[in-house]
Amino acid sequence: AIQAHNVANSGNISSTKSQIQVDAIDIQNSGLIATSDELKLNAQVKINNDTGVMNAGRIDLSAQNLSNAKGQIQQTGQQELNITAKTLDNRQGVIGQATKDNTSGNQTGTTAPPITDPEQNSSAQDSSSITVAEPIDLTPKTFDAGQIQIAQDIHNVSGQILNNADITLKVQDSIKNIGGEIQLPELQFNGQNFENQ
């Protein structure tokens, strides 16, 4: 866990197995923060991920103001991500479930590897050995349920808020979704202004 007054990352903070937790007044990321486990950021004032990338098995962000302009906040796990903020600026940003890149074509699925006769073209001799590997725990990790809860405003201009899990977006004041995309199972809006173009 990192605890500081201000945290600024323009490089790489990553972990292959452990949770990354940062507690600060302000957190600024223009680099990469990644883990296969949980990424938990708690800022008393602001999380600024403009042009930055956050990628984790589960994402849990809490701040008064969250800015993700041209940034990416991607969750690779199937659990619900959790974002709590007073305001969210997601102009040209992406928030949600990480997707596979299909820009090289419209191929779907996987291609089976060719199957060959193991004795054909084998150069193996009778001096082989067998090593027993230690067992690996393959139990999937479970995380807390989450939601995206914004107390005031969302500015999702040309941005994307996507998630294929059963997650709710709750907004109390206004949504500005101009040229943006919001794909979530549920949207609860109790505010004054909803602009969707």
Indicate where each model-derived feature is located:
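Compositionally biased, low-complexity segments
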Residues: 11, 118-119, 123
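Polyanionic, low-complexity segments and short acidic motifs
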Residues: 111-119
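Well-ordered beta-strand segments characteristic of repetitive beta-sheet solenoids
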Residues: 1-5, 18-25, 37-44, 57-64, ...
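Short, T/G/N/S-enriched strand-turn elements that build extracellular solenoid repeat scaffolds
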Residues: 7-15, 28-34, 48-54, 68-75, ...
